[in-house]
Each structure stands twice: as structure tokens, then as C-alpha cells.
């Protein structure tokens, strides 16, 4: 039985029209997204967060380790946390950074109660900077209620380290189980362990995009933005690690101080990736709002 040629032609034209409409909307969305990136000056914001992170990272780690000390087998968790963090978030330089950061955090943990309070304040400085920049990207002009602010800061300082500790416990249990069932794991799910750093990055960024902005963010948008940021983060980690291993000249120029510019560049790249994901998430929300309210132009601050 032959089909009507006119019907086939109509179906073909309909598919072609849908494809053209999809390409047109994708191009408009990309243009709107990059206009927002340029207008919000994301490279400048990433530089600011990298500088604040350099000042606050040791106090923040001291607070994180103090929270993790509530868990049993703290020494094991701390070693696993340091190994995971520096091997996955500071590529190709984890040995030197692990030694120096362990020394810094150990010295910071010996401070008095006043010194500990100052460490908490410095850690809050980083969280406040993240809060300010995220709300700038989401165009939030209103002030957050103090109870919500305390809740958000408590989640970042308390819940996140506990989640990381729990994930490390889970990964250690999986690794122990994998040693006893090596053939089964290698045939079925050996790659799941390799996905663990990516999944942890995805979960942390998803929580950041959902909790920090002083505005309602849909889970779908936050998940898409976090997925993009986590993928870019893995690509940046591999690329930066390859560059340091094969083309980096920092050691020959800076010598023993080579770790400082390397850390600064890596912090800058990491925050740029996180901010790009946040901008993408915010763009999804505003793009959907503009489609709902037809005829409304995208609003840029200023």
C-alpha cells in the first residue's frame, strides 16, 4: 500500500520546520546566555572569588575537619578526604599541596577559642562572597531573612562536610566490597568508582545552585546547570593537569613558590566553571519566564 505523496511531503516539511525552530531557539538562547556572561563580568567575579578563596581555604578546611571530627574513625576520614580533594581538585600537584595544607590546618587547629572564632569568620567570608555573587547572577535585589541566612550558612559549614564524610565512607565500603568481588565488579560496575568524583562534584554544585540564591530555582534547571559545570570541571581538571605535567614552566621560574600561582590559576578556573554553570541555570529560568510572558524583553541589571 503506497502512501499519499502529499502527506509525506507535509510530514517532511513539518519535521523541517520543527528542526529550524529548534535551531533558531538554540541560537537565541546561546546569544542571550553569552550576553549575560559578558554583562555580569564572570571573569572578574571568578578572580574575586579566587582571591577570597586563597585567604579562606585554610580556615574553611579547619572548620570542615572539626566537623568531621564528630564522626567515628576521624583520622581515616581525614586521610581519605585529603586524598580525594587534592587528587581530584588540584591536578598533578597533590603531593606538595597535601603536605603544606596538612601543616597549615594542623597549626590552625591549635589556636585558642578566639583564634577559632576568627577562623570561622574567615570561612564565612568565603561563603558571603559566594552568596553575593550568586545573587548577583540571579538578579536578586532583596535581602534574605536572617533565619534563612543562618540555615544556608549552617548547611554549607555543617551538612556539606558530613555529606562528604558519608560519601567517603560509602566509597570505602564499595572499594572493600570490590576487592572481595573483583571479577563481578570489573564485569558489571567497575567504572562506577571512577564516576564518584564527578558525582560528588555534581551533588555539591547542585546544592550550591539550589540553596544559595535568594530566589526559587527549579530542580531541573539546577540539575542541568550542575551537570554542565561538573562536566566542564572534569575537562578543565584534565586539561590543566596535562598542561602542568607537560608544558608548565612555573617550577623553573618560581622554584619552591611555584605552588602559589598554580593554586591561584586553578582556583580561578574552578570558580569560572562554577559561575558559568550558575549563569546557565539562571538563564534557563529567565528564558522560561520570558517564554511564559510573551513580548517581555530579557532584563539586564543596571
UniProtKB/Swiss-Prot annotation:
InterPro entries: UPF0761_bac (IPR023679), Virul_fac_BrkB (IPR017039)
Source organism, top-level taxon: Bacteria
Subcellular location, record wording: Cell inner membrane
Entry membrane topology: Multi-pass membrane protein
Keyword set, alphabetical order: Cell inner membrane, Cell membrane, Membrane, Transmembrane, Transmembrane helix
Cellular component aspect of the GO annotation: plasma membrane
Transmembrane segments: 51-71, 111-131, 150-170, 188-208, 222-242, 256-276
Pfam families xrefs: Virul_fac_BrkB
NCBIfam families xref list: yihY_not_rbn
Stored PANTHER family: INNER MEMBRANE PROTEIN YHJD, UPF0761 MEMBRANE PROTEIN YIHY
Family: Belongs to the UPF0761 family.
Protein name (record): UPF0761 membrane protein Tola_0461
Annotated organism of origin: Tolumonas auensis (strain DSM 9187 / NBRC 110442 / TA 4)
Top-level taxonomy: Bacteria, Pseudomonadati, Pseudomonadota, Gammaproteobacteria, Aeromonadales
